Amino acid sequence: KRVVGIGSPRASLEPNFLLKHWLGPTNFSSGLSDPEASAIEKLTKILSSTTANVPSVRQMESADAILILGEDVSNTAPRIALALRQAVRNESFSMAEAAGIPKWQDAAVRNLGQDELSPLVVVTSSESRLDDVASHIYCLNPDEIADFGFSLAEKLNGGEIEDEMVCTAADILLQANRPLVVSGISGSHPDILSSAAMVADTLSMSNKDTMLSLCVPESNSMGAALLRDQNTLSLTEVIEQLDKIDTLVILENDLSRRLGKNALQKLADSKVDIISLDVLENDTLNLSSMVLPAASFAESEGTLINFEGRAQRYFPVFEPANERLPSWQWLVKLASLGSDEKLSGLDCFDDVVSLLASSDEKWSEIDKVAPGQAFRDRGQKIPRQTHRYSGRTAMNASVSVHEPP
């Protein structure tokens, strides 16, 4: 019988990889919708080839001129939006430094700066929550946003462009010491990414401190895209092959957000058994024959590929409640029910990471992202709580109370 797995950009690398390793590439889908997968693939190629710097969130705060091209950053990347709010204050910090006021003297810095902000040019198709700190706001449709970006790149390269908006943005970026270009895939227009990359690359020819940041929609969108190859299935192909599939294993993915109404109805009408692993209630669980409760990010360990293309590890701070288990453990248990031994011998998280590192050259350094379970700090494990944790004995008083006689 054929079992097909659908991964998720919400889940970490490890369970996505285990699902692919267990069922094989020809029976695995990354869980990205077709337009989303195409856009993120293009985004990863841009990040790997751009001559501009790809900044961290902290580095974005140092920008002294910012261009947002076709991305509602407050919705897709709120932490980056906060960094941009910090960045526009750099003008007041420069004024304070010239006046001899230390940066930590916040009240004095704000009083001196008043409404003086570093330039922020927002070019989007709707209002955004950054409009209140923007110096220039241009509301255009997606086609016009892409054309704006290409015209701006041409102007930065010395071309003759008469458009006043383009000339204004070009002057702002050329006068900056650390310009930042921000874009992403939420505009659902393939040329917006290309135009943003062209602006950053053109600007970097004259300014090596130029930065380019491209936002992705979910925590591990980049990781899910990197697990795709020429043998893996798209979501469309999975739906087309439903009559040849006996069981679907869906990993932390709400397909109602990624499939059209007709495709979702076809899945509901099929005789496929669906096993879902998830921590959140969603419409996909209503279609499932079995639901396995997965641990949340705060109760499990995993690796994400962030918007920079950098691997980041997260660690559990709580024990999974009730019957919940990390997704990778559920997959190991499911695999052990059959005769397939591909996931046998995976006793701890480090074993999964080691298997991932040995599977492909691009993952060869993944086991160096963070220390393994054998790591000790002066002979002790890293505690989840401080030694003097207030209310420790009262946390579970509703379940059990231990008092001296």
Spans of model-derived segments:
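A glycine- and small-aliphatic-rich helix-loop capping segment at beta-alpha/alpha-beta transitions
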Residues: W22-P25, R85
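Short glycine-rich phosphate-binding loop at a beta-alpha junction
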Residues: R2-S8, P179-V182
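Short Gly/Thr/Asp-enriched flexible loops that form oxyanion-binding sites at enzyme active sites
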Residues: P15-K20, I80-L82
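Non-catalytic alpha/beta scaffold blocks inside enzyme catalytic domains
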Residues: L32-I366
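A residue-level signal for conserved active-site and pocket-lining positions in enzyme catalytic cores
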Residues: G5, L19-W22, V199, L334
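Long, structured ligand/cofactor-binding scaffold of large enzymes
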Residues: G24-S33
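Cofactor-cradling patches in redox/metallo enzymes
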Residues: I6-N16
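Long, low-complexity segments enriched in small/aliphatic residues
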Residues: A196-A197, F349-P405
